[in-house]
Structures are given as structure tokens and as C-alpha cells.
Amino acid sequence: MSAMEALILQLHEIGAVKFGNFKLKSGIFSPVYIDLRLIVSYPSLLTQISQTLISSLPPSATFDVVCGVPYTALPIATVVSVSNGIPMLMRRKEIKDYGTSKAIEGIFEKDQTCLIIEDLVTSGASVLETAAPLRAVGLKVSDAVVLIDRQQGGRENLAENGIKLHSMIMLTDMVRVLKEKGKIEVEVEVNLLKFLEENRRVSVPSVEKPKPKPRVLGFKERSELSKNPTGKKLFDIMLKKETNLCLAADVGTAAELLDIADKVGPEICLLKTHVDILPDFTPDFGSKLRAIADKHKFLIFEDRKFADIGNTVTMQYEGGIFKILEWADIINAHVISGPGIVDGLKLKGMPRGRGLLLLAEMSSAGNLATGDYTAAAVKIADAHSDFVMGFISVNPASWKCGYVYPSMIHATPGVQMVKGGDALGQQYNTPHSVITERGSDIIIVGRGIIKAENPAETAHEYRVQGWNAYLEKCSQ
């Protein structure tokens, strides 16, 4: 008895091959149903299938990574990967609207070749559904290997889409072996052969092609689209200085803040302050910081997070001991109180050419600025695009409401060289992840710079990482 015959008998013995009248995914009724989900409960059989699949491939089928079609082929692909030391990718059948929102998970490089692994092929639709997102991320797909080919047009349909199908077992061979070994009657074989003759080519349901990614606009083009003067100015500064780094200057005193602003000023496009934490604040603080900002050509962003009704925030913005309106180019606000907060801030800020960032998301664990709240912030920004210049955001690429206009700037807090978090719930992401994967524009870095032994050198490192990520995003 050959190894293939033994495998067919094992599949029949565990109940993976059933005869009767079954409706298939394609909609047609079949006298045979093959349920390979059962093999996960038989480790030795799963290992045997995985080893035979790879060994049956011709030398011409070269590949760098493997990807199993969800879901039954995933354990087969996993064993292939582990047994042969071949990197594996996973295709998400349902793309999540949180996290990275990726269709393909795993580590790979553009132009690598991916072998698709499938358990059963009828029309080839499931293989094509997996090939599409793999190709969309820059992988090459030229071969697929399958345990059982039902011989109903899958091979031809895949060939028309540039994929060569390699099959371990043909359905006609399976039925022949089962008849010869006395597992089924002659009538069953005749019935099946007649069915295959009448259903030689099952059409492939239309596979929705992934929408092409919109071209990433550079800061120069986006500056021309911005309706806010401070937004335009920030885009221009980022271009001229080649930096998308914002320093979160959360230090203990005004003296420290002015000192570090002067040290890292050449590396940043934006300096973020929390003026109400400075015990030595004096009325001339704003003019001193303004002089440093003008010297090093960066903008000042007071992270006040206004949240009250329109009339109150107007007074908070213009008055009090801090007089934020006098020296801060940019402020930010929550939208919890509704659009009236923007009206109030706009009343004072617009005549001075100031800009507003809306808090669409936050970087702290368990925060409530998600989903509908984020969508509401986008809607308010759209209605006030002459004053609202962008957002404080964490993962704008995943927003359900869709990516907002390129005229809007996204600034993301919680950035460090290494992913992680702190004891108070702050979540950190890397510059590359924030810019290329999460769709942001500006990295906001605090403790990673101000706690460094040499803040200026460290700021330069962040600047290089952030800017290189921006250039990479523009080249995609």
C-alpha cells in the first residue's frame, strides 16, 4: 500500500470523507463532503499531511514564506512552518477596527514570494481571497498547494489569476482507492464521476479586489490644502527643518523648560507645554519662550486641553495669570462639551492666526476617546477647518469614520524608541509605527528626551527616526 493510499484510508477512517447529498460553499449539491477540520485532533496525521504537502512540491515552486487559508489550513501551515523553519504569515478573515487593522500579520519584505496552503479546493475562490491581500502588501503569489483537489475548475481558475495549483490528492483518485479497498460501493464511485462530469467548472464568486491605497501626500502639498495659517506654517517648518518631532516639555520649573527648549530647539518643529505645572511661572515667561521659538524656528503648543463651555474657555484662553493667547501658537481641546467650545476658542484665536488641535484619541489605557467620540471630533473639525488644524490622535489609520482630510495634521503622544507603558497607564509606540502604520504626522516625545543624559543628542535621534518614517510613508 502506497503512502497516499494509506493517507486516504486514514481520512476516511476519522470521518473526514462523507458520502450523501451536501450543499457546498459554491451553492451546488455534492454526493461527497470532505471535512478536514477534524485533522487537528489527530497530531500524527496532521504532521504527516504537512510533511507530504511540502515534499510533493516541484523544485520550481520556490518561496520565502507560507500562508494558510483561514481557517482549516492554518494548522497545516503552522506545522509546515515549524517543521521546515519557514516563516509564516496569517491572513485575517475579518480585519479589526482597532490595533493595527492589518489584513496580513507577520514579518515579511516587499517582493518576497508566498506559498499559499489550502486543505481543499473546489473553485479556487478561497485561495484567491487570500492571494489578493497578500499581493496588496507587495508579496508575490505564484503557487498554491492543496491536500485535496475536487477537480471542479479550481486549477483552471487559479491559473487564470497567475497561480499554479499543486495537489496531493485528486478527488477521483480518492474515490477509486476507497472503492478498491472496499470502503464504498461501485455505485458511489459512478455517482461521483457523473457529478464531476456535470460540474467540471464551478465559477468563482467575484472576489472584491482591495481598493488601491490613496497616494500619500507630502507636507508641501498638504500645506497648500490647509485653511489655517498656523497649520500652513507648521507644515512649512517641518519641511524646511526636516523634522516632525514635538518635544513634550513636562519639566518641573519654567527655568528648566526654557533651558531644554533652547537645547533641543534645532531638532523640533513643535514644543508642547503644560504651563500650569510650573511653580516659578512669571508674566514674562511667554515672551522668553517666544524668543527661543523664533530663534530656532519652532511653534509653541500649550497642552491646555480645554473642556468647558464656550464662554468659560474664552476667558481661560485669553485671561488668567497665564494669558495663553499671547504666546501659544497652538492649543487643544476636548469636544465633550460640544462644538460650542470651538466657537469660543475661535472667537479669540482666529483674529490672532492661532490654531486648534482637537483631542480625537488619547494614549492612556482605558480612555473613553474612541469610536463615536472620535467621529464627532472629526465632524466638528470639518465644520471649523479654518481654525481647527488637526488632531491629537493615536491610530488615525484605523478610524471607522475614515481618514480625514490631508489638510489636517495628526500629532501622536506616547512615543518612545521601544514599545511599552508606564505604571500610570501611558502606552508607548515607536516613531516608525506611529508614522508608517498608524497614519500620524508628528511624534510627541517627552520623557524619552527630557530624562536622557544628553537631551539634544537624543532629540536628534528621534528626529531622524521620525523623519525617515515620514519619507518611507511618502514612498509607499
UniProtKB/Swiss-Prot annotation:
Keywords: Decarboxylase, Glycosyltransferase, Lyase, Multifunctional enzyme, Pyrimidine biosynthesis, Transferase. Its EC number is 2.4.2.10, 4.1.1.23. CDD domains: OMP_decarboxylase_like (cd04725), PRTases_typeI (cd06223). One of its GO terms (molecular function) is orotidine-5'-phosphate decarboxylase activity. The active site is at residue 305. It holds the Pfam family Pribosyltran. GO terms for biological process: 'de novo' pyrimidine nucleobase biosynthetic process; 'de novo' UMP biosynthetic process; cellular response to phosphate starvation. Pathway: Pyrimidine metabolism; UMP biosynthesis via de novo pathway; UMP from orotate: step 1/2; Pyrimidine metabolism; UMP biosynthesis via de novo pathway; UMP from orotate: step 2/2. PROSITE patterns: OMPDECASE, PUR_PYR_PR_TRANSFER. It comes from the Eukaryota. It catalyses: orotidine 5'-phosphate + diphosphate = orotate + 5-phospho-alpha-D-ribose 1-diphosphate; orotidine 5'-phosphate + H(+) = UMP + CO2. In the N-terminal section; belongs to the purine/pyrimidine phosphoribosyltransferase family. PANTHER family: OROTATE PHOSPHORIBOSYLTRANSFERASE, URIDINE 5'-MONOPHOSPHATE SYNTHASE. This is Uridine 5'-monophosphate synthase. It comes from Arabidopsis thaliana (Mouse-ear cress).
